[in-house]
């Protein structure tokens, strides 16, 4: 059975899920997960089943608790969508630098990891998916596996940013993207167009030369923006990224 370990590194709280065979030795790929790894906790039993049945190679999962997700998971500042929510600070690049310069070195030094790009992933849901895609474009030399579940593609300017990237030179990157057909169904703002923005992003990535066999894009009919669907697709994303 997988084992949770909790620790604090430089003021950042980490929740690590070590795979079932970790105590037996060996080195493992690592995936850094936004929102404290909540999506991994929601499907930890299913992950163990995937391990036992050989569907998924064992990996170390590192959930990172965000001090302020509206700041840490956004690439540039934007005003709040509504008066009841806070604005977006746009500290995403600094957050990713913290992962690369502080958290990843700690994990690689204290756990038996495979630390190269091909064995290092980053994943997240919603805004966590957005910052994971941003990591794919800004730091492809660090993160070779990227999973974006229901990424907040509505974020103003991000689709244009994605379209402006040179995806043909990122052929060593492996990318998984998921979205549900009913994302944003009850929203009255830009979030209502979540599905359209995600589809447009996928078209842009492929049009800019990214190899189609390196991108797994999944839509679920009836899928909404909640943990039920995030947790369902998280193990499938890991399976595709690491097999």
Locate the predicted segments by residue:
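Non-catalytic cap/lid and distal C-terminal segments of serine-dependent acyl enzymes
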Residues: 1-243
């Amino acid at each position: 059975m997988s084992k949770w370990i909790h620790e604090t590194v430089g003021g950042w709280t980490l929740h690590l899920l070590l795979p079932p065979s970790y105590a037996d030795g060996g080195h493992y790929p690592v995936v850094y997960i936004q929102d404290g790894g909540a999506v991994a906790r929601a499907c930890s039993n299913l992950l163990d089943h995937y391990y036992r049945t050989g569907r998924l190679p064992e990996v170390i999962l590192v959930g990172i608790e965000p001090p302020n997700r509206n700041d840490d998971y956004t690439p540039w500042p934007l005003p709040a969508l509504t008066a009841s929510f806070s604005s977006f600070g746009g500290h995403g690049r600094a957050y990713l630098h913290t992962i690369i310069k502080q958290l990843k070195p700690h994990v690689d030094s204290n756990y038996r990891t495979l630390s190269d790009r091909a064995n290092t992933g980053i994943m997240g849901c919603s805004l966590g998916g957005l910052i994971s895609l941003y990591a794919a474009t800004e730091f492809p030399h660090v993160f070779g596996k990227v999973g974006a579940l229901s990424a907040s593609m509505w974020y103003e300017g991000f689709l244009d940013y994605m379209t402006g990237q040179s995806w043909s030179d990122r052929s060593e990157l492996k990318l998984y993207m998921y979205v549900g057909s009913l994302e944003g169904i009850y929203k009255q703002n830009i979030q209502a167009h979540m599905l359209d923005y995600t589809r447009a992003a996928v078209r842009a990535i492929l049009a800019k030369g990214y190899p189609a066999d390196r991108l797994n894009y999944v839509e679920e009919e009836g899928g909404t923006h909640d943990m039920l669907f995030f947790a369902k697709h998280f193990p499938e994303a890991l399976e595709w990224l690491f097999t």
